């Protein structure tokens, strides 16, 4: 999805230092933008006819917009059509629908669950309702200030067909989930994400997830995963990712990857030897943020939803068992 462009769409950015991402040397030049297209990098001089002119502050750099390959921005995009903090950093493309937990693609019951479970990350969908990929695209059409790509979400789709059921999807549920992936791709989704630390995404095993992700192969789209394991266990997490890719016949991508370099290299070499196209993104700092329950509570305690989890934690006996590591 592309942003809406102002009238006049032809704009000259004048007085900057151009870093085009191709050459090693910057150059002093002006940049002519025509809607979504860079129409030219031109020598300093009088502006072309019929274009707006923006005079840049001394020392300004003109460069291609940055891509945030992993962002939770559904809420501000639906509400305002933009993410101001990202724009201020030069981010012009956002990839949402991450970690298998987006209310884009949700049925109303799933949206209500995500409003309780994941709203601190994605924002809430109010009122909770069915919101397909096509419906989201329609809701933001003509209002965007940034390019937006949407991933379908495996956990969302799993909740649509099975709620918080911990067991494997039965054949009918698998077929229903696969149809949802096919429809999301037809509606413009650019891949399928999962979040194997989150519920109910983590309840899907390799065979199930590969079957649900199978439509990606024909569409040429990737399977993008928040792994089940990072750090000391990252090799196992990447092996599972590669197994899903092999089963689905799709390219795979590891979200916010971290671990020991030797472990990462071995896992990537193993994936390549198995014929799996594996890529990754990584953030440049040592801290992250997520849902506290993911880190501290066993999955079985969360399996009936946030309200039931809070009720269980109110029981002194349950708290004692947790503190004892039982």
Protein language model regions, located:
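N-terminal metal-binding scaffold of metallo-dependent hydrolase/deaminase domains
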Residues: 1-48
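Divalent metal-coordination and catalytic microenvironments
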Residues: 16, 31, 36, 59, ...
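Hydrophobic faces of well-ordered beta-strands that scaffold small-molecule active sites
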Residues: 67-71, 94-96, 148-152, 192-194, ...
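Acidic-and-aromatic substrate-binding clefts and catalytic sites of carbohydrate-active enzymes
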Residues: 75-78, 201-204, 229-234, 258-264
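A short acidic, amphipathic alpha-helical/loop segment
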Residues: 81-87, 91, 208-212, 240, ...
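Hydrophobic, small-residue-rich alpha-helical packing segments that form membrane-like cores
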Residues: 99-106, 114, 120-227, 231-240, ...
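Polyanionic/metal-chelating signatures
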Residues: 105-126, 134-137, 144, 155-169, ...
